């Protein structure tokens, strides 16, 4: 059985990790063993924060909608309840965009929600 030398594959693997560690400071971007740990941790953070981003954006949308509805004398929960009863199915992202970019249109939505209550 011939001897298998893995120089090419290990070199490619090292190169891939060091390329991913580009931009890190100190030995974190040049020493393979340390760079491997930092890249792995970075991927863990990225995975975690992709989940957290969804939560944070939803919280932001709710805060924006709440602020806009309070200008019209209504709370967020009353507004959402009114929208559901009126049969208006807009998600929070669209509602927050409407509240910022088109306050008049948002005002009509608030009036419809009030009428449905």
UniProtKB/Swiss-Prot annotation:
Family: Belongs to the bacterial ribosomal protein bL20 family.
Gene3D superfamilies assigned to the protein according to its UniProt record, in alphabetical order: 6.10.160.10, Ribosomal protein L20
Protein species of origin: Magnetococcus marinus (strain ATCC BAA-1437 / JCM 17883 / MC-1)
Gene Ontology MF: a single term: rRNA binding
UniProtKB keywords: Ribonucleoprotein, Ribosomal protein, RNA-binding, rRNA-binding
Matches recorded under InterPro entries: Ribosomal_bL20, RIBOSOMAL_L20_CS, Ribosomal_protein_bL20_C
Coiled coil feature spans: none
CDD domains hit by this protein: Ribosomal_L20
Protein task: Binds directly to 23S ribosomal RNA and is necessary for the in vitro assembly process of the 50S ribosomal subunit. It is not involved in the protein synthesizing functions of that subunit.
GO biological process terms on file: ribosomal large subunit assembly; translation
Superkingdom of source: Bacteria
Name recorded for this polypeptide: Large ribosomal subunit protein bL20
GO cellular component: ribonucleoprotein complex; ribosome
């Amino acid at each position: 059985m011939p001897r298998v030398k893995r120089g090419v594959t290990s070199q490619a693997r090292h190169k891939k990790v060091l390329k991913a560690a580009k931009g890190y400071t100190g030995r974190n971007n040049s020493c393979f063993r340390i760079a491997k740990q930092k890249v792995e941790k970075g991927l863990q953070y990225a995975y975690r924060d992709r989940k957290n981003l969804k939560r944070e954006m939803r919280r932001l949308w709710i805060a924006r909608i709440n602020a806009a509805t309070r200008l019209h004398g209504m709370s967020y929960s009353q507004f959402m309840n009114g929208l559901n009863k009126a049969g208006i199915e807009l998600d929070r992202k669209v509602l927050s965009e409407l509240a910022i970019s088109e306050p008049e249109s948002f005002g009509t939505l608030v009036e419809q929600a009030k009428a449905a209550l």
